[in-house]
C-alpha cells in the first residue's frame, strides 16, 4: 500500500489503483459519467477532472503514486468538471419526471444534481436519426445518447461480441451496430451488456418503456408537449426545481417497483442479478454484483423470462381419467399419488419405483427428492440429468484428483496463460464464461486452443483450432502426455511431490505416439507437436470441456485423459490452472451434490458405507436401502423388463432429452403409475397419470450450485401462479401423505439438515449466503470455503493425486455405406435445450423460431441442398424431417442439429449406446443418412445474429474523438494520458 492525499486527507491506496477508485472508496463525490469499474477507463466524458500535483488530469485514467496530492473540488477541477458535463447535456434532453429511467440510478440525472447544474449552457441539439426499435428486447434513441462509449466498451471488450462502435468522424456521431446496420439485422446477440451499462435512457429494455414511471405511459404527442413545458420552464426556474419534482416521482416508484436478487435458471455459469418487477410484470434484469458474472448476462438470463407469466403455465393438478386429463384439487392428487405408490410398493417392492430429480430445481428440492425415495419409499432408484451429460467428467475427476467439480473459479480461467477448450461450444452453451476467455484472449495475450468437430465462434477465435475425427480426443490427449514425458517437458517436481502412479501411466501410453495419434485423429504430427510445445511453455493452463467429450462411449476415459494431462504438466493447485467440466444446467452440479444419485447420498457419501447410513438413519429414524439403485438409463431398461412399475419425475423432459427417445416413450407407456411435476404440460406429461404444478425459480426460495461449485441463494420474486406450489413443498406434502412427518416450513431448514449430515456442506447456511454472498464447496463448519481446490492436498487419503491409465477403443456407431453421415448435436445460444422455457419469450421465438440441421457447403453442393431445403434424416433408431442451413461451421460429411425442438427432436435419431462406466448415452456417436425432400424457406430469419458482420476494434477508440475538430478539452493544461497497462 502507498499513501496519497485527497483534498488534504491522507488515504491509503494500492500501487496500481486508479485515482477515481481511491476517491470513491474514500467517500468523496466526484462526477464520472463514462467510467464504470467493470469496464475500466474509457476517457470519453471528461467529467472526472481532478488536480494532481497542480495539473488537471482525468481521475479514471491516472494511477496513484506515492505522495500524490489530489484535489477534487478546486476551482480549476470544478470548472473543468462542469464544462465537460455541459458538453454531455448538449447531447441529452432532460425530462426525468416522464422518463422510464428515473429510478435513482441514472448517471446523467445524478451528475446534474451533484454538480448543481441550474442551466444548460450549450443548447441540446437532436441528432438526425430515428429511434432504432428493431431488436425485440431493447431500443436505442440516438438523440438521448451522450456518446460515453460504455456500451461500445462492454460489447467490444467485456462481452467481446464486437458489434458496437461509434462513428466519431461523422458530423453527428452515434452508436453503430455492425458499422451501420439496424440492430435487428446486426450481429447483436442480445446479451444486454450495452443496456445494463448505459448511464441514461439512450438504451433501454422495452419491458421498462411505459411501465416504470407514473407519467411515462403517455402518447408520444402528449409526452412531447410535457417535455416542451419542462424546457420552457427551465430558463427561469433552473434544473433544481425540475429535478426535485422528478425525485418525488422517483420516490413514488420505490413503493411499487420491487428489486429482488435471484440466480439464473438456465446454464451452469451461476449468473445472479436483481429482478425488477411491478406487480407480476418483469421490468428488467439488472446485473451488477454477481460473483460469477458481474455485469454480464446472455440473451436468456437478461431477456428470457417469458415463461414466468406464460398463459399456458400449469396452475392446478391434473389427473388422467378415461384417457383424458381433468383438473383436480391438491387433496385429490396427493391422495391418489400416496395410494398408488403405496400399493405398488406393497405389491412389487420399493425397488419397483423410481424417482428423477430436476437440475432446474434447487439443492433443497433435490435433497428432499432423494430423501423421499430413500427414507419414505425405501429405494436408491434416484437420479438426475447429470447422467445425460456430466457424470463422465465427474468420474474422470474422482479417479484422478478426488472431487467431482471445477477445480477453481471463473477468475482462474481469466488468469490462465493458456486455455484449452475441448468439446465445448462455450460461446453458446456457457456464454458468460466465454466472455471471460474472449476478453483475456483479446486484451491480455491469453493463448487459446480449441478442439472440436465444428468450427464455432471459439474455434474461429483460437490460436490453434484442432478438428480431429469424431470420438478421438482421448488419443491426442494421451499422445501429448506421452510427448511431454518423453521429451522431459513434464513438471517433474509436481509429479514427484503430488502424484502417484507415474510408472504405470507411462507404460499405458506406449501405443500413443504422435504418429499413431495423427493416423487415428487426422491431425498432423506437426500440429500436435505445436500444441504440446504451447502446453509445455504455459505457466498456467486451464482446460474446459463439456458434452463434446462426455457424451461419447468413452466419455469417462476422455475426461480422465484431460485430468491426466493437467497432472503431467502440474496444472492443479495454483491460481489460473485446473480442470473445468462446464456444467450444463443451472443446478446439475447441485442436484448431484445433494444426493440425487443412485449410489450416493448428499456430498457424495456412498450408500454402501455403513457409517454414512447409520448417521442418516439416526437422523431420519428409518432403515435405509444398502445397495446402489438404478440410474436413468437402467430405469428405462427395467420398465421394458417389467421390473419398474412407477416413476415420479420432477422438471425433466425425459421423453425427448434421453437418447433413443422412441424407446423411452414406449417405456413410459408401460408404467402402471406415472407422476410428472413441472411448470408446463411438457411432452413427458402426456404419459403421466398425475401432473403436479410446480413453481419456477422466481416463485420460490432456495439455493443453486453453479459449475464453479458456487452455492448461491435465490429469493422469491413473485407469488406462485394459481394453485402452483414450490417444488420443495410439494415433495414434503407427498412424503407426509405417505406417512412421513416432515415439518419443513422454509428451505433454510432443509439446508440446515443437509449441513448437519454432510461434511462437504457443514458450514453452509442461509445467513452466510445472504444477498450476493456465496460459498464454494467444500465448506468447513466455520464457514470457510475453497474457491481453489487442492491447495493443501488432493482429496485422497494420502493427499496425492493419481494418474489413471486409459486406453482407446473407438466409437460404437460409425458411418457406413448405409448411414454415411455423422450427426453431431448440441445447444444454441438463444434456446435452452428443447426450448420449453425459451420459446415462451416472444423475442427469442422471433430470432430463432425453428430447429434446423447444419450442412457443409461441400455436402450441400454434392446433394443439391440449399438453406431452407427440407431433408429427412434417418438413423438406425428413428427419423426426423427438418430444414437445412448451409454453413461452413460444419465440414465434409458432418451434420449438426441443435436440440431446440420438442417436436423435431434430435433424440429421435440417437441410439442407446452408452459410456459403460456411467451409463451416459453416447449422443455424439450417431450415424444417419440424408434424403433430400422439397425446397423451403431458410429456418433462420434474417434478424438472426448469425447473419451479422461484427466490427472488431479495441474498445471505444477515444483517440478518434480527441482528433475531431470540434473537440475541446475542458480546463486549462489538461494532460492527455495514455493509460499504462496494469502490471501483473
Task: Place the predicted regions along the sequence by residue.
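N-terminal cofactor/phosphate-binding cores enriched in small/glycine residues
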Residues: 11-66
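Short beta-alpha connecting loops at secondary-structure transitions
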Residues: 5, 66-72, 177-180, 460-468, ...
Amino acid at each position: 500500500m502507498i499513501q496519497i492525499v485527497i483534498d488534504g486527507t491522507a488515504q491509503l491506496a494500492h500501487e496500481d489503483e486508479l485515482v477515481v477508485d481511491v476517491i470513491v472508496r474514500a467517500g468523496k463525490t466526484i462526477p464520472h459519467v463514462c467510467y464504470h469499474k467493470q469496464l475500466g477507463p474509457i476517457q470519453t466524458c471528461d467529467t472526472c477532472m481532478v488536480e494532481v500535483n497542480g495539473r488537471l488530469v482525468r481521475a479514471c485514467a491516472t494511477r496513484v503514486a506515492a505522495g500524490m496530492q489530489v484535489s477534487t473540488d478546486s476551482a480549476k477541477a470544478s470548472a473543468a468538471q462542469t464544462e465537460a458535463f455541459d458538453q454531455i447535456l448538449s447531447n441529452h434532453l432532460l425530462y426525468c419526471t416522464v422518463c422510464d429511467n428515473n429510478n435513482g440510478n441514472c448517471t446523467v440525472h445524478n451528475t446534474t444534481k451533484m454538480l448543481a447544474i441550474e442551466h444548460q449552457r450549450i443548447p441540446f441539439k437532436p441528432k438526425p436519426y430515428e429511434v432504432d426499435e428493431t431488436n425485440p428486447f431493447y431500443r436505442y434513441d440516438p438523440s438521448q445518447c451522450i456518446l460515453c462509449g460504455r456500451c461500445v466498451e462492454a460489447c467490444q471488450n467485456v462481452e467481446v461480441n464486437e458489434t458496437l462502435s461509434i462513428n466519431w468522424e461523422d458530423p453527428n456521431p452515434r452508436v453503430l451496430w455492425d458499422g451501420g446496420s439496424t440492430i435487428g439485422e446486426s450481429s447483436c446477440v442480445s446479451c444486454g451488456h450495452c443496456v445494463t451499462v448505459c448511464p441514461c435512457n439512450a438504451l433501454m429494455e422495452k419491458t421498462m418503456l411505459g411501465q416504470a414511471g407514473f407519467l411515462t405511459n403517455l402518447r408520444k404527442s402528449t409526452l412531447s408537449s410535457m417535455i416542451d413545458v419542462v424546457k420552457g420552464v427551465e430558463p427561469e426556474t433552473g434544473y433544481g426545481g425540475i429535478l426535485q419534482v422528478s425525485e418525488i416521482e422517483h420516490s413514488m416508484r420505490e413503493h411499487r417497483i420491487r428489486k429482488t436478487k435471484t440466480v439464473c435458471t438456465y446454464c451452469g455459469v451461476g449468473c445472479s442479478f436483481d429482478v425488477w418487477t411491478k406487480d407480476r410484470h418483469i421490468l428488467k434484469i439488472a446485473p451488477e454484483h454477481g460473483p460469477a458474472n458481474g455485469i454480464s448476462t446472455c440473451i436468456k438470463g437478461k431477456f428470457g423470462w417469458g415463461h414466468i407469466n406464460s398463459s399456458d403455465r400449469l396452475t392446478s393438478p391434473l389427473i388422467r381419467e378415461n384417457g383424458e386429463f381433468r383438473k383436480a384439487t391438491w387433496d385429490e392428487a396427493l391422495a391418489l399419488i400416496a395410494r398408488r405408490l403405496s400399493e405398488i410398493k406393497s405389491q412389487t417392492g420399493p425397488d419397483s419405483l423410481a424417482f428423477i430429480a430436476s437440475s432446474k430445481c434447487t439443492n433443497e428440492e433435490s435433497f428432499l427428492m432423494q430423501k423421499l425415495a430413500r427414507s419414505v419409499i425405501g429405494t436408491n432408484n434416484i437420479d438426475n440429468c447429470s447422467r445425460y451429460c456430466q457424470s463422465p467428467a465427474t468420474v474422470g475427476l474422482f479417479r484422478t484428483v478426488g472431487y467431482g467439480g471445477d477445480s477453481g473459479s471463473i477468475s482462474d480461467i481469466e488468469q490462465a496463460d493458456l486455455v484449452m477448450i475441448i468439446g465445448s461450444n462455450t460461446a453458446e452453451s456457457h456464454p458468460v464464461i466465454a466472455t471471460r476467455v474472449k476478453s483475456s484472449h483479446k486484451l491480455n495475450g491469453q493463448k487459446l486452443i480449441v478442439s472440436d468437430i465444428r468450427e464455432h465462434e471459439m474455434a474461429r477465435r483460437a490460436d490453434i483450432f484442432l478438428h480431429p475425427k469424431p470420438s478421438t480426443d482421448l488419443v491426442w490427449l494421451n499422445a501429448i502426455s506421452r510427448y511431454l514425458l518423453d521429451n522431459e517437458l513434464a513438471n517433474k517436481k509436481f509429479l514427484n511431490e503430488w502424484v502417484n502412479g507415474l510408472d504405470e501411466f507411462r507404460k499405458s501410453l506406449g501405443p500413443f505416439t504422435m504418429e499413431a495419434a495423427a493416423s487415428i485423429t487426422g491431425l498432423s504430427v506437426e500440429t500436435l507437436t505445436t500444441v504440446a510445445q504451447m502446453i509445455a511453455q504455459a505457466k498456467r493452463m486451464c482446460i474446459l470441456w463439456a458434452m463434446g467429450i462426455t457424451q461419447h462411449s468413452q466419455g469417462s476415459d476422455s475426461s480422465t485423459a484431460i485430468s491426466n494431462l493437467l497432472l503431467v504438466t502440474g496444472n492443479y493447485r495454483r491460481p489460473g490452472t485446473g480442470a473445468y467440466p462446464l456444467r450444463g444446467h443451472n443446478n446439475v452440479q447441485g442436484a448431484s451434490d445433494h444426493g440425487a444419485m443412485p449410489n450416493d447420498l448428499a456430498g457424495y457419501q456412498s450408500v454402501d458405507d455403513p457409517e454414512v447410513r447409520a448417521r442418516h438413519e439416526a437422523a431420519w429414524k428409518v432403515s435405509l436401502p444398502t445397495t446402489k439403485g438404478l440410474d436413468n438409463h437402467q430405469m428405462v431398461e427395467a420398465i421394458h423388463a417389467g421390473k419398474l412399475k412407477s416413476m415420479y419425475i420432477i422438471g425433466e423432459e425425459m421423453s425427448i432429452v434421453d437418447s433413443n427417445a422412441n424407446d423411452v416413450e414406449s417405456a413410459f407407456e408401460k408404467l402402471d403409475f406415472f407422476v410428472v411435476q413441472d411448470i408446463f404440460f411438457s411432452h413427458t406429461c402426456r404419459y403421466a397419470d398425475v401432473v403436479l404444478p410446480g413453481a419456477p425459480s422466481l416463485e420460490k426460495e432456495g439455493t443453486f450450485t453453479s459449475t464453479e461449485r458456487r452455492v448461491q441463494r435465490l429469493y422469491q420474486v413473485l407469488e406462485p401462479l394459481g394453485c402452483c406450489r414450490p417444488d420443495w413443498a410439494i415433495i414434503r406434502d407427498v412424503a407426509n401423505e405417505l406417512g412421513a412427518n416432515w415439518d419443513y416450513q422454509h428451505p433454510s431448514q432443509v439446508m440446515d439438515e443437509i449441513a448437519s449430515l454432510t461434511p462437504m456442506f457443514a458450514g453452509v447456511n442461509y445467513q452466510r449466503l445472504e444477498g450476493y454472498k456465496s460459498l464454494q464447496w467444500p465448506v468447513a463448519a466455520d464457514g470457510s470455503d475453497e474457491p481453489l481446490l487442492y491447495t493443501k492436498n488432493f482429496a485422497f487419503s494420502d493427499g496425492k493425486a493419481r494418474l489413471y491409465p486409459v486406453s482407446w477403443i473407438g466409437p460404437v456407431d460409425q458411418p457406413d455405406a448405409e448411414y454415411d453421415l455423422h450427426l453431431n448435436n448440441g445447444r444454441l445460444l438463444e434456446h435452452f435445450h428443447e426450448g420449453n422455457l425459451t420459446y415462451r419469450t416472444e423475442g427469442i421465438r422471433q430470432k430463432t423460431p425453428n430447429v434446423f440441421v447444419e450442412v457443409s457447403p461441400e455436402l450441400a453442393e454434392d446433394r443439391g441442398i440449399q438453406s431452407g431445403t427440407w431433408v429427412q434424416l434417418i438413423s438406425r433408431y428413428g427419423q426426423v424431417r427438418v430444414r437445412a442451413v448451409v454453413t461452413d461451421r460444419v465440414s465434409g460429411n458432418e451434420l449438426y442439429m441443435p436440440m431446440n425442438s420438442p417436436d423435431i427432436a434430435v433424440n429421435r435419431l440417437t441410439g442407446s449406446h452408452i459410456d459403460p462406466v456411467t451409463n451416459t448415452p453416447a449422443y455424439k456417436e450417431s450415424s444417419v443418412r440424408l434424403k433430400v425432400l422439397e425446397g423451403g424457406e431458410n429456418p433462420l430469419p434474417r434478424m438472426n445474429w448469425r447473419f451479422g458482420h461484427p466490427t472488431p476494434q479495441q474498445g471505444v477508440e477515444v483517440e478518434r474523438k480527441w482528433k475531431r475538430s470540434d473537440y475541446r478539452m475542458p480546463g486549462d493544461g489538461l494532460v492527455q494520458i495514455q493509460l499504462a497497462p496494469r502490471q501483473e
